[in-house]
């Protein structure tokens, strides 16, 4: 019946919804179960497994020694059915609610204890510590010291009990397991919340079942103290995920870190209390009713959500959470006894579920003492919103009564204590548990005299914004009210937030309690991040500065300001939700042009101006008329009106924060990665740099622990400050604190300010540089003056563009760069160095926003001249890392080593580590051979993968194009296959090669030297750059006439001999280089055997780029060769570097031609067979490798094993293979095919000398590259494959 959930972190904090409060420590678990428990009276508890069991367990922990048959029953039932559905074991068993001996409780535990979530986490860890056999005194873990304190009746004096509670809470803090875990020295002390288990009762329960079955976890509210994110449930996992993802920037896939999660929950709790005014009393308050108040108030306060208790036949069966949002008033209902949850607006399904699944629970709550019930019901009616998730538990919100002083000032709250056993009530039925609203004072008494006496002594003149329930007045003004800001603080603040929440229902709920309280309200602009918090009385609001902000900065008249109670920022439209849009500041005067149309739509009382007074934030002037208020500002405070102080805190409510973040560009401080999606930058840091970046600032940490420590020490403190400010405002109404969020959005509504063009002070720039070098010091936040911040809105455009002109440090935009990076970036961006020192607008620059590097405010702006910037770091490792990452990004300077494309959906690596496009990579993976270039067609640099076509209408027309690709591809493949020659690709994209029209080689050299400053591989890049620009040219060469060449072949000596020989060549350079050994054929290319250059033709000149000329040259040469066989003879004076190749005639170009030398090879050699038998490399199917028919092959060549020319013995027009019977339509394909036939047989592979059985076997062998291993090939003197 009970489904056990075993989340990594258990929320033991509250076994029952009531226990939510209990974790607070105010009520012991027993108290949490009080209602049920009492209802479950020990005898009846058998069926009431949840509450009873929990109570028993609690009682167990409280009094292990006293067994009671009824408690035994309950325990049995719990054990048998685990009906409770709670996963927590009884405290005595070391269950989730451990009962620690007094000494076991530690402050650490207490901290963990502080919040239910934390408790949940710690609990599983520490629960084993609970000793069933703890002494009753030690065991008495009234979960909160409050219970101890609560019982004035107790033997201990209230003060003593309070002290005890404090001590326990301090100890319990460490436990964090559950408030219950705190042992109270006074075993008899009933759990707080007035759940007063009589000692005997508790003892009986405790002793009854040393091994009570684990109870199902009760539901509670989990809330992020940073942004207000919250939910209602029994598992803190989502809260931890949220915190990790949105506040630590950690990916949840790396969640397996129990220690970090525990710390997060502990932090969550500690922050909550640190925000509280009574932080100094945290230890006591953790277990005090105050905490109970805080936690229980959470459901009510959370973003306008509140809980609706669902009862069936008088039994509290679950909770409905009303969540006003843009989807309407949605509720989700959850069963109190199991995890059954559904979304909807009706509790009918929950009631049916309860009757079907938990029929045995029906009586459980009925037995609860009627005394408590009536009060419970009454209180529920009077304070519906305050009802805690566990209405069945007495001492919960539904029973809470506000205690007021003579002047109607709320001073505290009381909850009736429900005795466990009528026999043990001893006339204390009327006893209630009281706790102070302003501190952690609590007591048990039959009257409120003690509380009032305490209030008179301690807080006589103080009214702090504790519970700010009354928002009715502010409802009409809800548009400016943002409840999220204060969500993180202590109960008082929490309640304050509630006040802020604009939902009317919530306000109504609170109206019963304390409309008299001072409240802190956050006002925020709907269009930008202007925000401030004010403390004020219940009947006034301080909206003047906001209205003036709207009018002055956004040109929005107050009458047109919209407000929706369900959309905190007011940015909603009727179709998005069911809420009513109001115009809270509309004057509704018929002569007002702004209200003319509004009057048609506004409901009569929407403005509510008559009910609420507007107070000036600079003086005590109040008026119900907004117009009068604005006139007051203009007449009295005009000079000071703009003096709004911003709080330095940058961790504000989540509402505006996230939307603001989206508009900002995020740049990596370690490389040039830029994105507008914050999650991507966090992921980039994790994956690319193996570090974690703080979401709130530019701090990066090597591990999650240090990141959490940074967050705790820096940003949590900031939060505390903000909260404190919010509350202090109550006492200093004269100052408005604007709370800038982490990011600032800039709207076109902003008028440009002259300050935009002013240079930033040197101190600002220096400070930023210091911070960069120091590696993310947080001092920026304190150093940056409020004046700097005040200009944020004016300079927002610069900020968004990443301009260092603004003190980005103060905005959280500063992304520090390491010293070496900064230097190289400064070098690289020297043209724009001055931009770093000027706060000039960037509008005039025709460069993408991304061209500016946010992270390098001091000369770090990226130069827009170069399309891509390469990260240069002093360390080779980081350099290589960033380069490899850079290459992987689309269009960032890498091109395919096989087909030279720069555009692909995915970059892959070939066997040698070089980058290849997706198509080439997949082809090579599938066929074990590089992708033939004849199936690659490029259009504007983009590959068009087409089918091979054997029939071409105009073969001549395609020769040039194919020739280029054939040469590029064959050379590329040669290098791909050669591990010796594989090097990292050059970083220049084709845009450098083709778009930079440098007319002479000297300019290429200059370009190379320029590149030198961009990359750490300076010598390599220089040679690569030169080689690319010099050797790319053979692809577009123009030769007037081959016969004209009469110059000295010596011209072919390579200009870039030294550089070109660099093994770290570019993808193109490798095509131009001869193989290391004439016979060496790197593996992988189907046409590698033809790739060996014969000699360096002086074919490089920028002017020869015409495809037509290139084609004309080859056509002329093709025609000349058959009729001029002497051209194929060795030219005596030719410096032929590859003696084993048939020499081509040397063509002398005009003297101004720059010779590239022997590094160039051209497609001419494709038609010539190596003189040695089969030096050709592994041959992929020659049919596939269609090369342009540049030269007519002279039939099957007779191979002579000397350095002589291969002569043709067949008619040159014969293109049919005599062995395979294949007829080729062009001579080159025929030559390629014939070169695969060895000399020892018709079907011998010339590459590996393998003898195939027939032509099919031979064709398969060649196409698939099934050559024998390298060792055997080498042994036979054949080239390695």
Curated annotation (Swiss-Prot):
GO cellular component, one term: nucleoplasm
Compositional bias of kind Basic and acidic residues: 53-63, 148-162, 488-512, 980-995, 1060-1072
Modified residues (Phosphoserine): 90, 127, 178, 216, 978, 1041, 1066, 1085
Post-translational modification summary for this protein: Sumoylated. Sumoylation in the repressor domain inhibits the transcription repression activity. Sumoylation on Lys-1201 is the major site. Appears to be sumoylated on multiple sites.
Keywords for the protein's UniProt record, in alphabetical order: Disease variant, DNA-binding, Isopeptide bond, Metal-binding, Nucleus, Phosphoprotein, Repeat, Repressor, Transcription, Transcription regulation, Ubl conjugation, Zinc, Zinc-finger
InterPro entries: TRPS1, Znf_C2H2_sf, Znf_C2H2_type, Znf_GATA, Znf_NHR/GATA
Extent of Low complexity compositional bias: 1050-1059
Region (Transcriptional repressor domain): 1163-1281
Crosslinked residue numbers (Glycyl lysine isopeptide (Lys-Gly) (interchain with G-Cter in SUMO)): 1192, 1201
GATA-type zinc finger locations on the chain: 896-920
Positions of crosslink type Glycyl lysine isopeptide (Lys-Gly) (interchain with G-Cter in SUMO1): 766, 1201
Main location class: nucleus
Composition bias, Polar residues: 40-49, 163-189, 380-391, 961-977, 1040-1049
Family matches, as SUPFAM superfamilies: beta-beta-alpha zinc fingers, Glucocorticoid receptor-like (DNA-binding domain)
Gene Ontology MF terms: DNA-binding transcription factor activity; DNA-binding transcription repressor activity, RNA polymerase II-specific; protein domain specific binding; RNA polymerase II transcription regulatory region sequence-specific DNA binding; zinc ion binding
Cross-link Glycyl lysine isopeptide (Lys-Gly) (interchain with G-Cter in SUMO2) residue location(s): 29, 76, 263, 418, 457, 474, 488, 645, 737, 755, 766, 825, 850, 877, 879, 925, 937, 965, 1003, 1012, 1030, 1040, 1070, 1192, 1201
Function text: Transcriptional repressor. Binds specifically to GATA sequences and represses expression of GATA-regulated genes at selected sites and stages in vertebrate development. Regulates chondrocyte proliferation and differentiation. Executes multiple functions in proliferating chondrocytes, expanding the region of distal chondrocytes, activating proliferation in columnar cells and supporting the differentiation of columnar into hypertrophic chondrocytes.
Protein name: Zinc finger transcription factor Trps1
Organism for this UniProt entry: Homo sapiens
Upper classification of the organism: Eukaryota, Metazoa, Chordata, Craniata, Vertebrata
